[in-house]
Amino acid sequence: MILTIDVGNTRIKSAVFKYNTIIETAFFSNKNFQSEIENILNLNNKIKVLVVASVGKLEKEAFELFSNRVYVCFISRESTFPFQNNYATQSTLGIDRMVLSAGAVFQFPKKNRLIIDAGTCLTYDFVDENDVYQGGAISPGIRLRYEVMHNYTAKLPLLTLQEPQSLIGNTTNQSLHSGVVNGLTFEIEGYIEAVRGKNENFIIILTGGDANFLAKRLKNTIFANSNFLLESLNNLYQYQK
């Protein structure tokens, strides 16, 4: 059995794999990550491998304390990836974007792939049908958009995600919800159409914490999977061997 760990900007997500199938997932904070992982290992004593990717504050050393119980595989830019990297500044490319791109190559061979990760930030990554990573785009995610409008204005309230009642909001709160949710939806749809216009044999992969919410709003046919990064870590570990 394998335990994969995705250390994000705001939380940690994990998945336990048995025969390459997820049998359980969990979410927890950076503060109590050690006790949470120990609890998972205690409840699943057949776990032999811990696979980690981190864009958050926890680095490799934080997970080496588990090396007396399991083999720890820390995915980094020095790991082996199944694509050619054409990014101009490879040292700045987030490991989460690299892992997601690897997963797209593994699960959808010989296709042009656009991977959209809806988390703290919204990231777009494009890997072509020849397995060449070309780059993408980064913009604020849902929660960040709400927070920025509150933090950088004098009177706009801080709201949490809510489905807008209409396109044209008739209160300040509804205007904020419409701006965040509809604005982000239009952005994603527009980006998809721009990429589609230049590429055939095209698949869209939507993942991240807000994937399920956004999937219902998008007109395009997409493959939505909130566990895609965790699955990609499992596949990438197999690829290292």
From Swiss-Prot:
Q: What does this protein do?
A: Catalyzes the phosphorylation of pantothenate (Pan), the first step in CoA biosynthesis.
InterPro entries referenced in this protein's UniProt entry, alphabetically? ATPase_NBD, Type_III_PanK
Annotated residues for binding of substrate: G94, I95, D96, R97, T172
Q: What is the lineage of its organism?
A: Bacteria, Pseudomonadati, Bacteroidota, Flavobacteriia, Flavobacteriales
What does the record note about the cofactor?
A: A monovalent cation. Ammonium or potassium.
Report the EC code(s) recorded for this entry: 2.7.1.33
Where in the cell is the protein located? Cytoplasm
Stated family: Belongs to the type III pantothenate kinase family.
Q: Which SUPFAM superfamilies match?
A: Actin-like ATPase domain (SSF53067)
Organism this protein belongs to? Flavobacterium psychrophilum (strain ATCC 49511 / DSM 21280 / CIP 103535 / JIP02/86)
Residues the record lists as binding K(+) = D117
Q: What is this protein identified as? A: Type III pantothenate kinase
Q: What is its main location?
A: cytoplasm
> Where do the catalytic residues lie?
D96 (proton acceptor)
Name the cofactor(s). NH4(+); K(+)
Q: What biological process terms from GO does the record include?
A: coenzyme A biosynthetic process
Q: In which pathway does it act?
A: Cofactor biosynthesis; coenzyme A biosynthesis; CoA from (R)-pantothenate: step 1/5
